[in-house]
């Protein structure tokens, strides 16, 4: 084999926290929270891996912000719709939003655009052969991006841009009109959007 990927799962660790003794609800070991990071017990919040949601450091950071804002009486909610996920391999594997399979399972009629990373001149210049692929998952009815995946070096540096488009439900036609600096690897996003009719 040329490449081997070993993946270990994660699970929340809520043992020995005494949560059951105060009545905090757990689901498969995860602390149940609402979109404000509140548990069912007033004054108790749960962020990070313990709530079993996204289980990524950058998600935990945002969940903590939401919890603090809620505690301070400021309006804020947590959305998991466009949390980027990255495997820091060579090349990197990045994803945000829904995969094609997840979108179809939700009953969405989707189009998929796959383009080689060679569409980005800078990517080709900085990566021998320009190997890699970028994929957009597009809701055909709403004409918005619902997901993206990339197998490409430094895809972690541009995948969050797609996350913003997903979170704000930016129409694909506006993405096509967005001007990206040239030469950048992030141009691949617009290039893929332009492949959708």
Model region roles, listed by residue range:
Residues 38-39, 43, 79-80, 126-128:
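Solvent-exposed alpha-helices and their adjacent loops that cap or buttress functional pockets
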Residues 24, 50, 83, 117, ...:
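Hydrophobic pocket-lining residues within nucleotide cofactor-binding pockets
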Residues 4, 82, 131-133:
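Short beta-strand-initiation
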Residues 72, 88-197:
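Flexible, glycine-rich terminal cap/loop adjacent to redox cofactors
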Residues 3-72:
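FAD-site-proximal beta/loop scaffold in flavoenzymes
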Residues 29, 84-85, 134:
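Small-molecule pocket liners
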Residues 76-92:
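Flexible, acidic loop-helix segments that line cofactor/substrate-binding pockets
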Residues 58-81, 108-110, 167-172:
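Internal hydrophobic alpha-helix adjacent to the cofactor/substrate pocket in enzyme cavities
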